[in-house]
């Protein structure tokens, strides 16, 4: 980056923030939808520990009357295995998951848009590929 124009430096800094956010939010989704085999650990770790995640926050913000049990389970850590499994199943079936995926795609698209004024060189192509990888990864 040394010697790069200030506009390029700013674009890359902003890109890093956006793609980093998209990566973390995708990780939130993966923790809900993935399997032990793919993750190498039990899914729903954040849910078990009561850590706020994008799918959970979206579910709380868009809770419907029939989501009472999910809202209750999202309000605390789920150390009980049965409650954890129930919470995970409810969250997997909730429309918040679709909205969360859409938001991650928006963040990755916003990151990609920051690259448009950069030179068309292999590094830019690699960063654009990173945008795709962030939204398609499963573990």
Q: What kind of feature is each model-predicted range?
A:
Residues 1-139:
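All-alpha prenyltransferase/terpene-synthase fold signal
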């Amino acid at each position: 980056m040394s010697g790069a124009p200030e506009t390029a430096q700013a674009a890359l800094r902003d890109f890093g923030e956006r793609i980093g956010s998209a990566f973390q939010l995708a990780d939130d989704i993966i923790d809900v939808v993935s399997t032990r085999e793919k993750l190498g650990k039990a899914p729903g770790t954040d849910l078990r520990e009561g850590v706020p995640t994008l799918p959970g926050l979206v579910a709380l913000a868009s809770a419907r009357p029939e989501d009472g049990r999910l809202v209750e389970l999202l309000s605390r850590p789920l150390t009980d295995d049965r409650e954890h499994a129930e919470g995970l199943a409810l969250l997997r079936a909730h429309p918040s998951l679709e909205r969360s995926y859409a938001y991650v795609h928006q963040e990755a698209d916003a990151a990609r848009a920051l690259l448009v004024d950069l030179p068309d060189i292999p590094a830019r192509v690699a960063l654009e590929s990173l945008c795709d990888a962030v939204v398609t990864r499963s573990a």
